[in-house]
Amino acid sequence: MARSFTNVKVLSALVADGFSNTTTRHGFAAAAAATQSATRGGASIGGNMVPKSGEEKVRGGEKVSWVPDPVTGYYRPENTNEIDVADMRATVLGKKFNQ
């Protein structure tokens, strides 16, 4: 009797797994079809627009090169000036909080 229960358990797991795979594949097919229809002209972005890289967004025509910061080791733009943390806090918070 115990063998039959394990066989039924295995069979039901296979059936349930097959059903799950079928629904997953159907969902993927529907998503792929929606993507293809959108790129054909449904919700497409203008063809003449070219996205700008990060450097072009920052300064317009000026090129920005990124160099490692000698103190922290993180990369930062080369032409940025160093600012003191206390000065930045005073600028951002204003006189109300800096009394």
UniProtKB/Swiss-Prot annotation:
Start-end of Basic and acidic residues biased regions: 53-62
Pfam family, one: LEA_3a
Entry keywords, A to Z: Stress response
GO cellular component term, pick one: mitochondrion
Spans annotated as Disordered: 40-62
Recorded superkingdom: Eukaryota
InterPro entries: LEA_3a (IPR004926)
Example GO biological process: response to stress
Induction: By auxin, heat, ethylene and wounding.
The protein, known as: Indole-3-acetic acid-induced protein ARG2
Source organism (scientific name): Vigna radiata var. radiata
Designated gene of the protein: ARG2
